[in-house]
């Protein structure tokens, strides 16, 4: 199957890692739906993606809302007629130590990071199973494997992503659908850029490659797992962390 001309939905793709993933797919000729809770930013990103010579559409999406998720997939079916790739990238953090964490902060992170991936995957599989082809790539985190103080909700949500991924892989391999996860480590973002230099240097000491990752380091892994070339890879977690976790 040709990669060029396929249709991808990338959640949380108005900026950051999600935007880089969308751009990476578009550079391969994939049509991309930009879905994000921030529609204004999504529209800007979609315009940039369309400038790469592919079709692109921006949709508002709160992934924790089953109604909004269903509406987005109906829109994709109506406007594109198919869906080949789903990247569950939408996610948030609400940090706090276990004893200080509010229940609503636990629920919010689980609902967006894990329930959102569940809802989107469920709708995607309905389409992909009929096509007998599909690629689902979920964004996990090194925190799912190493833990991180102050992120009990985030770590639990990303560990759940790994279990979700492996189960989907087993359930739908016979339908030509693969499901894999990418687990980023410390990635250079506006937040990490703002850290004091001494803090950044301490963080780098935990990374054998002695640098932070870039959004394109993550995007490149996602693009490969989204491609027809990855057809014999399913149920796997690809770690993109410079050797911080092995």
Q: Which sequence ranges carry the predicted segments?
A:
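Canonical Rossmann dinucleotide-binding motif of NAD(H)/NADP(H)-dependent dehydrogenases/reductases
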Residues: 2-33, 168
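Short, small/polar-rich loop/turn modules that mediate ligand/substrate recognition or access, typified
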Residues: 82, 173, 178, 233-235
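Active-site helix of classical SDR
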Residues: 121, 157, 165
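Residue(s) in the substrate-gating loop at a strand-loop-helix junction
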Residues: 141
């Amino acid at each position: 199957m040709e990669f060029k001309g396929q249709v991808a939905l990338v959640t949380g793709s108005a900026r950051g890692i999600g935007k880089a993933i969308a751009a990476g797919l578009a550079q391969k000729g994939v049509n991309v739906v930009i879905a994000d809770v921030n529609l204004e930013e999504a529209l800007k990103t979609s315009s940039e993606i369309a400038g790469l010579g592919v079709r692109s559409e921006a949709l508002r999406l709160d992934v924790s809302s089953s109604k909004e998720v269903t509406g987005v997939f109906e829109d994709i079916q109506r406007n594109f007629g198919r869906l080949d790739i789903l990247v569950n990238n939408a996610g948030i953090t609400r940090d706090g130590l276990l004893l200080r964490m509010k229940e609503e902060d636990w629920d919010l992170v689980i609902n967006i990071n894990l329930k959102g991936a569940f809802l989107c995957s469920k709708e995607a599989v309905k389409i992909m199973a009929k096509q007998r082809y599909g690629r689902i790539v979920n964004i996990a985190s090194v925190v799912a494997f190493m833990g991180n103080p102050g992120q009990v909700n985030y770590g639990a949500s990303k560990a759940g992503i790994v279990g979700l991924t492996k189960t989907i892989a087993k359930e739908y391999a016979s339908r030509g659908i693969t499901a894999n996860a990418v687990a980023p480590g410390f990635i250079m973002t506006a937040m990490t850029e703002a850290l004091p230099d001494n803090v950044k240097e301490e963080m780098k000491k935990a990374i054998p490659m002695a640098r932070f990752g870039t959004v394109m380091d993550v995007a490149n892994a996602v693009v490969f797992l989204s491609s027809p070339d990855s057809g014999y890879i399913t149920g796997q977690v690809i770690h993109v962390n410079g050797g911080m976790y092995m």
